[in-house]
């Protein structure tokens, strides 16, 4: 929602009761940092609030007790991580990070779909896409991909995660770390290309 060109992906979001996203997964905030938007905060308050006599605030109306919105009565100050990220990178820096990651992922997607022994499973959405290695001589393509993901991750140049699309074990690619640079896409491409040539 921070980049205008991707706001179309949020169409219909007004029908949702809540939205959660994790800035520690993509935006570079320190772990753990989640953001939770609620349409009606009273629903969560009614679910989670615990008000024994010793916690009641008498004679004061309209006080928001944040302990009413979480299971524990106290809260860590997680918002500070996000505040520091926004202060250090700025909204323009965060937008650039998102745009770069999406563009770099799309660039990699278009390169690897031309490789032999690669089957693209899903197109990139916000920089995330899936693919798998194929080999007509392999009896079990899922096992082949599981083995290749382990090899790639053990080498330590890039890190990929497997998932399932239907019954197919596929490989997820997502550009998404604060320190990532454009040449890291070249490293990922060479790594995937080398495996596709050996498959």
Residue ranges and their predicted role:
Residues 107, 111-115, 147-158, 191, ...:
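Generic non-transmembrane alpha-helical segments
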Residues 2-3, 9-113:
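Active-site C-terminal subdomain of aminotransferase-like
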Residues 119-152:
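Conserved PLP-binding catalytic core of the aspartate aminotransferase-like
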Residues 165-199:
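PLP-dependent enzyme catalytic core of the Aspartate aminotransferase-like
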Residues 84-85, 130-133, 171-176:
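Short, hydrophobic beta-strand segments
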Residues 25, 88-91, 135-137, 177-181:
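A generic structural motif
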Residues 128, 154-172:
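Conserved PLP cofactor-binding pocket of PLP-dependent enzymes
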Residues 115-123, 162-163:
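Flexible, glycine/charged-enriched surface loops at secondary-structure junctions
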